[in-house]
Structure formats: structure tokens, C-alpha cells
Amino acid sequence: MILPDHKIRKEILIEPFNEKSLQPAGYDLRVGKEAMVNGKFINVEEEGKLVIPPKGHALILTLERVKLPDDVMGDMRLRSTFAREGLLGSFAWVDPGWDGNLTLAFFNSSEEEVILHYEERFVQIAFHRLEEPSKNPYRGIYQGSQHLKLSKRKIR
């Protein structure tokens, strides 16, 4: 079951919470303070925006911290405005028990720059209730993230 707006407001910790971001069946996450575009760190809060060049790759931190109970998972989708501009997003499930800001990956498939502004709504997250609480909620290496996180995968 996907949680409706009133249950999201009551059951999911999102901070800072923005009433304009609350949707009938989800919440619009906003561009946070940090990003990395083609390997270069950007202080989005200071710059006011980030620019993803054509065929460019970006990691973007969400403004919001999201904390999920052990019986709820998150599923994220790029807002259609950005898909229409050629932006593609690759997002993992947000596991039950997750707590932190999210680092999300994007690719600009277009021939034009895509500009995202600090605090702009860019990804919607929907919350799905599990049949029962997870016996093994997320407690992994990215738990508690407050800053942009690069891959912690070990390459041999």
C-alpha cells in the first residue's frame, strides 16, 4: 500500500518539511546543499544552482533528511519536467530503517545544459508499507548521511 499525504505527514520524518512538497501520494524532495558534476564538487547553497552539461553526470544531495520506520520503504522517481529536458535518474530503493539525506545520480542525455536550483523540487518519493516490519532494517554504510556520499564499493 502506498501512503497518502496525511499518513506521510504523520508517519514519515522528513526535515525540513515543506508543505508545498507534499503530494497526494508522495513527497517532492528538493536539491540540497552539495553536488558533484563530472567529478567536481559544487556548493549548491553558495552557488544557488548547479549546471549539468550535455552528456554530463551528477550526484546531488537532497535537502531533506528522510527517516523511515521498519515497515516502510521509499521508491523515487524523477519529476517529469526534468525528464522532458533529457535528465535521467538512477535511484535505489530507500530501505526500511533508512535515516539520512539521499545522494542521487543523474545523467543529462540531451544536447543542452540542465540547470537545477538550490531547494528546487526534483524527485518525488512514494512510501510503500510492507506487510510487516523488516527483520533486518537498513543499518548499512550510508546510514546517517548528511553530506554527499560517493561510492564505497571496493574495486579490485
From Swiss-Prot:
Please list the residues that bind dCTP: 79-84, 95, 124, 138
UniProt keyword Signal, yes or no: no
Pathway stated in the Swiss-Prot or TrEMBL entry: Pyrimidine metabolism; dUMP biosynthesis; dUMP from dCTP (dUTP route): step 1/2
Q: Does the keyword Signal apply?
A: no
Q: Which InterPro entries match?
A: dCTP_deaminase (IPR011962), dUTPase-like_sf (IPR036157), dUTPase_trimeric (IPR033704)
The alphabetized UniProt keywords are: Hydrolase, Nucleotide metabolism, Nucleotide-binding
- Show the Pfam families listed in the entry: DCD (PF22769)
Gene Ontology terms describing biological process: dUMP biosynthetic process; dUTP biosynthetic process
**TM spans, by residue?**
none
Q: What is its EC number?
A: 3.5.4.13
Reactions performed catalytically: dCTP + H2O + H(+) = dUTP + NH4(+)
Q: What domain of life?
A: Archaea
Q: Which GO terms describe its molecular function?
A: dCTP deaminase activity; nucleotide binding
Record function comment: Catalyzes the deamination of dCTP to dUTP.
Assembly information from the UniProt record: Homotrimer.
NCBIfam families in the record: dCTP_deam
UniProt similarity note: Belongs to the dCTP deaminase family.
User: Can you name this protein?
Assistant: dCTP deaminase
